[in-house]
Regions:
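C-terminal/domain-edge helix-coil "capping" segments
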Residues: 70-74, 78-85, 135, 144-156, ...
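Signal peptide-directed extracytoplasmic domains
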Residues: 92-163
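A short, hydrophobic beta-strand-centered structural micro-motif
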Residues: 101-116, 161-163, 195-233
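N-terminal secretory signal peptides that target proteins for export/translocation
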Residues: 1-22
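Amphipathic beta-strand/beta-sheet edge segments enriched in Tyr/Trp
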Residues: 54-57, 132, 136-137, 211-258
Length: 272
């Protein structure tokens, strides 16, 4: 059941369909207006949501470089996806022209190479940084409403991936909480859970059922040499999805993001 990826799911998961300006000619202006109006209210109001839901960390160049706006847009996309439970918002084309700056409450940079000395000016500019951004809750709510989405503020169910992996060397393994041979996959899954604010509960070795109280997502990941990546297929409550030619990080984002989309109130994608 899990050795084939549905044809509609091939390629990168979570990609939004291109925005067609002819369908909603005023949407870009509407979103821009929402950003400005929401920022005024958002900066004045204390957030009632956990910081985890309104904060994202992305890679960026040195502080002050011209790439800050794209980095802020990436961070905003992650937060919108996390707050709504719709992973498609990460790559929503409608966000491409927006400036997220008015919604930023605070931000900070972390030098990834902090223990390595600076060698020259060029090296300084080329050093990678992690940019952590916290956005205003009121502004996020307004923006999600303009995008046809709602905030997912209630308790989130624990997700228990019940997965088999076939590695590049042909070795088969189950993804469990206590097998040291799947440390890399487990770390990628943990990162995906944090990205979408979905708690993860892995089974122990030998378990044939999900941990108590968790929602099981069945599936498998197979390394496919011709695609130079992982082909993954998942199933939850009779609904299936997947991804192909993916890294482990991308495959587990597809798993957790797809589960969030199906488990959020109302389930499924919001109407466009």
């Amino acid at each position: 059941m899990f050795n084939r990826v549905p044809s509609r799911a091939r390629g990168r998961a979570g990609r939004a369909a291109p925005f067609r300006s002819g369908r909603r000619p005023c949407l870009a202006a509407l979103l821009a207006g929402v950003m400005v109006a929401a920022a005024a209210a958002g900066h004045a109001a204390a957030t009632g949501l956990p910081d985890q839901l309104v904060t994202a960390t992305v890679r960026a160049d040195a502080p002050g470089r011209s790439d800050r706006a794209p980095a802020l847009r990436r961070a905003l996309g992650i937060v919108l996806a996390k707050l709504s439970g719709n992973p498609a918002l990460e790559a929503d084309a409608r966000m491409a022209a927006l400036d997220p700056t008015p919604l930023v409450l605070d931000l900070s940079y972390e030098d990834v190479l902090i223990d390595k000395p600076l060698r020259d000016e060029q090296g300084t500019y080329d050093r990678p940084f992690l940019l952590t951004v916290r956005f205003a809750e009121a502004g996020l709510r307004e923006l999600l409403a303009a995008l046809g989405e709602r905030t997912w503020t209630g308790p989130r169910p624990r997700v228990a991936p019940m997965l088999a992996l076939r590695h590049r060397d042909g070795r088969e393994a189950a993804l469990t909480a206590d097998d040291p041979l799947v440390d890399r996959a487990r770390a990628a899954l943990t990162a995906a859970g944090a990205r979408y604010a979905v708690p993860i509960a892995l089974p122990l070795r030998g378990a044939d059922a999900a941990p108590a109280g968790a929602v099981a997502v069945a599936g498998r990941l197979d390394w496919v040499e011709s695609e130079f990546g992982w082909r993954a297929a998942f199933e939850l409550g009779g609904q299936s999805w997947g991804v192909s030619g993916a890294s482990l990080d991308e495959a587990f984002r597809a798993l957790v993001g797809g589960a969030a989309l199906r488990l959020r109130p109302g389930g499924g994608a919001a109407p466009r």
